[in-house]
Curated annotation (Swiss-Prot):
It holds the Pfam family Ribosomal_L17. Transmembrane segments: none annotated. One of its GO terms (biological process) is translation. Residues 124-133 have a biased composition (Basic and acidic residues). Belongs to the bacterial ribosomal protein bL17 family. This is Large ribosomal subunit protein bL17. Keywords: Ribonucleoprotein, Ribosomal protein. Residues 124-143 are annotated as: Disordered. The lineage of its organism: Bacteria, Pseudomonadati, Pseudomonadota, Alphaproteobacteria, Hyphomicrobiales. PROSITE patterns: RIBOSOMAL_L17. One of its GO terms (cellular component) is cytosolic large ribosomal subunit.
Length: 143
């Protein structure tokens, strides 16, 4: 019987699972939409929703709790300054999971997990900024 077992193991150790979900949470908070497997998306949703609720609290202790969980201070600043105020009047339900077919390599069920009222320009914004910075570095080196 599987009574009392919470979550999935994903054939990973506890530390690997913890870091995997921290990395997924950072990606989701940065891009506001990611594509992952359906079971990972289902387990990621309560983690990120709790982080957004901490962000809505807004005090120093909540900020330190979020930093301890995901370890990326730039994303924590974005969570507290941009994402949490957007959901100030919403009590939970910040994320949606949409099924996205099956992956070709192993036929795994895929899903898109995104914020409900997401900023559509946020997806890939960090990558665009990085590419522009690399472009200016390459131009400066060539000159």
């Amino acid at each position: 019987m599987r009574h009392g077992f919470k979550g999935r193991r994903f054939a990973r150790s506890i530390s690997h699972r913890k870091s995997m979900f921290a990395n997924l949470a950072v990606s989701l908070l940065e891009h506001e939409q990611i594509v992952t497997t359906l079971p990972k998306a289902k387990d990621l949703r309560p983690i990120v929703e709790k982080l957004v609720t901490l962000g809505k609290r807004g005090d120093l202790h909540a900020r330190r709790q979020v930093i301890a969980q995901i370890g990326n201070e730039g994303v924590v600043k974005r969570l507290f300054d941009t994402i949490a105020p957007r959901y100030a009047n919403r009590n939970g339900g910040y994320l949606r999971i949409m099924k996205a077919g099956f992956r070709h390599g192993d036929n795994a069920a895929m899903a898109v997990i995104e914020f409900v009222d997401r900023d559509t320009s946020a997806k890939g914004a960090g990558d665009r900024a990085r590419l522009e910075a690399e472009g200016t570095d390459a131009e400066a080196a060539a000159a």
